Amino acid sequence: MSKIIELPEVLANQIAAGEVIERPASVVKELVENAIDADSSQITIEIEESGLKKIQVTDNGQGIEQADVIMSLRRHATSKIKKQSDLFRIRTLGFRGEALPSIASISRLTLKTATKGEIYGTLLIANGGKIEKEEAISTPIGTKVSVENLFFNTPARLKYMKSLQAELAHIIDVINRLSLAHPEIAFTLINDGRELTKTAGKGDLRQALAGIYGVTIAKKMVEISNADLDFEVSGYISLPELTRANRNYITILINGRYIKNFLLNRAILDGYGSKLMVGRFPIAVIDIQIDPYLADVNVHPTKQEVRISKEKELMNLVSSAIADSLREQELIPDALENLAKTSTNKKQKFEQTQLPLKQSNLYYDKTQNDFFLKETTVSEASSEFTVVDKAVNITDNVSGHSSVKYAQRQMRTCENKEHPSLTMTDKQQKRQLSRIVESLENEEKSTFPELEYFGQMHGTYLFAQGEGGLYIIDQHAAQERVKYEYYRDKIGEVDNSLQQLLVPYLFEFPANDFMTLQEKMSILNEVGIHLENYGENTFILREHPIWLQEKEIESAVYEMCDMLLLTNEVSIKKYRAELAIMMSCKRSIKANHTLDDYSARNLLIQLSQCKNPYNCPHGRPVLVNFTKADMEKMFRRIQENHTSLRELGKY
């Protein structure tokens, strides 16, 4: 008897469902994508108990003809592709014909559909993949799919479900991203009878952003646009003052499909450069139109990973689109808004001074700042970075080799109290620094307001006035920016001549990194780093380039190897620019340091000559601005509608 058998169709569908259907959100994604492919203009998603009890998706699309209804539940039955060459010009969201049979195999599925050219519609009921009923019915044009008792015959899958709130959050995230990908479609999401999401479907991406994130956020989104012969990039990005603590608010779309792509995420951050604080991420919707021949979507069951030809050119296009758009914006943060944001943060406690004023006298419209209430602020009491102990000399007598030094990864230090938000691991910080350096090198000259200095507070903040109102400058951040640009400009071409080491260094790597570095060793050789094999997963360095100081060898080699593993290239300028960031931080004036008038005015003059005077190299704001209108609002000289009290006859 043969040991190899063909699996029953129901079992095969359940196995396929394990790849495609991970949770209720996966069902929602597949059904809504089918509705989008059917040219729907309205899609309603109704769920109960976060989709575990019921998911119902209703659309007004083309519908399914009666002859095709049963075929739609067969594996690999699809109307999207017909021959092999079609795989290279896919423009629909679905094409494999796996989703519907996979869903039907692990639930009770009810499908009602009708097309424009048929008198009657069709009702189909399947339970666990087996068709129980098919009949003609009267139903509106379009399709309604109901999925009940999800995972009823695969209880092991239910064990891995999180809370109802967590599963609901995944569903909302799916609908939000599909809404941003298709602003021309009106989406409605209802959970347990309560409407959670609703978009207008007018084709305006900014309007879709307002429907998902709120009007206040949509107003702070900046449009971007760029194109070349292969790609068209458009979308919206948030101003640098509007950030999140993770990448979840970055949406990348290719031909209307939401994808995940590490390199494109990096390109977005590169476009911001030092305008973002370290560890903060923007809200962004990047819509990329591309010839289907340049994108392969058939590489992952969920189709969220896409292989892109000419990926480096696309990265440059995205980065330049963002940088060009931000260059046109006024990037001095509004001080009144920041004051409202920090004052509502309950995690920080401040000593309060009693004033003979009622609390209600301070005028803020806090509803306008609701978006910021959920942000977390790290206390200045964050622990400082520590330095790893220096390497220990170890004598190796094998094969007559001289003494060698085992290299250790070291962490550069900076006065962390001057950057209370930079409480990151060494690896995270290096990645962030690498990310901003490229844009720091290419910054263009910005216009800076003409300021008149008139005072200092607590040896930390400088006060100046200009046509735009009152400006408050962080003296450490200001001098850090000035010194960074000074050190950066001193970085030029370096001498790759080599110098012999008296004591060679040994560098150990994980096995996978070691093999990758072996393949790419020629790239390291180009910048004067010559590593030789020395035992298992270990390289030995016997000489170093003259431009690299011996005390920097350990950290420099590890950092350049990390750079090579991450980006497939090594840039000496990039590495030296990271040093410039550290040097500017350590050698700048600190808080509680009193400046005389001459030094303060000179600092403002130097700041005005910087290419980017608005942010320190770490992304913190250098100055904030109180406009005259802000001051008048704080002192109640104008009302909410900006009507002057003098005009009202009350002053």
Curated annotation (Swiss-Prot):
Gene3D superfamilies: 3.30.230.10, Histidine kinase-like ATPase, C-terminal domain, MutL, C-terminal domain, dimerisation subdomain, MutL, C-terminal domain, regulatory subdomain. GO terms for biological process: mismatch repair. Pfam families: DNA_mis_repair, HATPase_c_3, MutL_C. GO terms for molecular function: ATP binding; ATP hydrolysis activity; ATP-dependent DNA damage sensor activity; mismatched DNA binding. InterPro entries: DNA_mismatch_repair_CS (IPR014762), DNA_mismatch_repair_MutL (IPR020667), DNA_mismatch_S5_2-like (IPR013507), HATPase_C_sf (IPR036890), MutL/Mlh/PMS (IPR002099), MutL/Mlh/Pms-like (IPR038973), MutL_C (IPR014790), MutL_C_dimsub (IPR042120). Keywords: DNA damage, DNA repair. GO terms for cellular component: mismatch repair complex. Belongs to the DNA mismatch repair MutL/HexB family. NCBIfam families: mutl (TIGR00585), PRK00095.1-3 (NF000950). This protein is involved in the repair of mismatches in DNA. It is required for dam-dependent methyl-directed DNA mismatch repair. May act as a 'molecular matchmaker', a protein that promotes the formation of a stable complex between two or more DNA-binding proteins in an ATP-dependent manner without itself being part of a final effector complex. This is DNA mismatch repair protein MutL. It comes from Streptococcus mutans serotype c (strain ATCC 700610 / UA159). The gene is mutL.
